[in-house]
Amino acid sequence: MAHQAHAYHMVDPSPWPLTGAVAALLMSSGLAIWFHLHSMTLIVLGMILLILTMIQWWRDIIREGTFQGHHTPPVQKGLRYGMILFITSEVFFFLGFFWAFYHSSLAPTPELGGCWPPTGLTTLDPFEVPLLNTAVLLASGVTVTWAHHSLMEGERKQAIQSLALTILLGLYFTALQAMEYYEAPFTIADGVYGSTFFVATGFHGLHVIIGSTFLAVCLLRQVLFHFTSDHHFGFEAAAWYWHFVDVVWLFLYVSIYWWGS
């Protein structure tokens, strides 16, 4: 590589944006084929290619930042802005679901019986599993903050323990959510209530799984001595994402489970 007289990272040529684009094409085409022809071959192929792309792309980023020293302060600043903009885009993504929910519930149409929840629909008790889920996610927010402070203070063992605890709480939340879906007295096909409930809580659940995976990678990197007390943006990004997931759940709980029922 030629000598560069600036602190910015000139990225090497990479095949992963191309393979990622092909994976996206396969998955979107595969989704249409699955809906109409009931064949999952293409969507599964797309998913496998996407997972392989993500693993290898992120492996390259870890190599560049941890072992090659490309993540200088200006580069880290750019990554921070990128993560902030990504989380902002996610906020607007969920805003659409809340909009759909409030549009339907604040002025219920005669087809719904003029009331909310719609006539004849049994809702979930907000003070049972949903309240436990709220407590679990809030506790995980505390443990991820504990992990961050341990990391900044060089308390390696505490950082590993608190990070592992956060991941366990995330998995517990996912298991409780799966159980709740399995036992729910309504389905996604039960009108606008069922569709807004399952789409909003389902996408949140997907974000919890993504966040847990993100934190699991950080745990592995912490075990392998990748992070130092002043160079750990990978973990910081995961913590920001986890807090975002936390806050979205609080809005979901208050809006859909408590007020909406």
Swiss-Prot record:
GO biological process: mitochondrial electron transport, cytochrome c to oxygen
EC id: 7.1.1.9
InterPro entries: Cyt_c/ubiquinol_Oxase_su3, Cyt_c_oxase_su3_dom, Cyt_c_oxidase-like_su3, Cyt_c_oxidase_su3-like_sf, Cyt_c_oxidase_su3_a-hlx
Ranges in the topological domain labelled Mitochondrial intermembrane: 35-40, 106-128, 184-190, 257-261
Reactions performed catalytically: 4 Fe(II)-[cytochrome c] + O2 + 8 H(+)(in) = 4 Fe(III)-[cytochrome c] + 2 H2O + 4 H(+)(out)
Gene Ontology MF terms: cytochrome-c oxidase activity
Chief location category: mitochondrion
Gene Ontology CC terms: mitochondrial inner membrane; mitochondrion; respiratory chain complex IV
Bilayer-crossing regions: 16-34, 41-66, 73-105, 129-152, 156-183, 191-223, 233-256
Leading EC class: translocase
Key words of the record: Membrane, Mitochondrion, Mitochondrion inner membrane, Translocase, Transmembrane, Transmembrane helix
PROSITE patterns, A to Z: COX3
Gene3D superfamilies on file: 1.10.287.70, Cytochrome c oxidase, subunit III, four-helix bundle
Membrane topology: Multi-pass membrane protein
Topological region Mitochondrial matrix: 1-15, 67-72, 153-155, 224-232
Keyword Ribonucleoprotein belongs to the record: no
Subcellular location: Mitochondrion inner membrane
Job of this protein: Component of the cytochrome c oxidase, the last enzyme in the mitochondrial electron transport chain which drives oxidative phosphorylation. The respiratory chain contains 3 multisubunit complexes succinate dehydrogenase (complex II, CII), ubiquinol-cytochrome c oxidoreductase (cytochrome b-c1 complex, complex III, CIII) and cytochrome c oxidase (complex IV, CIV), that cooperate to transfer electrons derived from NADH and succinate to molecular oxygen, creating an electrochemical gradient over the inner membrane that drives transmembrane transport and the ATP synthase.
Subunit description: Component of the cytochrome c oxidase (complex IV, CIV), a multisubunit enzyme composed of 14 subunits. The complex is composed of a catalytic core of 3 subunits MT-CO1, MT-CO2 and MT-CO3, encoded in the mitochondrial DNA, and 11 supernumerary subunits COX4I, COX5A, COX5B, COX6A, COX6B, COX6C, COX7A, COX7B, COX7C, COX8 and NDUFA4, which are encoded in the nuclear genome.
Family indicated by similarity: Belongs to the cytochrome c oxidase subunit 3 family.
PANTHER family for this protein: CYTOCHROME C OXIDASE SUBUNIT 3, CYTOCHROME C OXIDASE SUBUNIT III
UniProt protein name: Cytochrome c oxidase subunit 3
Species of origin: Danio rerio
Higher taxonomy: Eukaryota, Metazoa, Chordata, Craniata, Vertebrata
Gene giving rise to this polypeptide: mt-co3
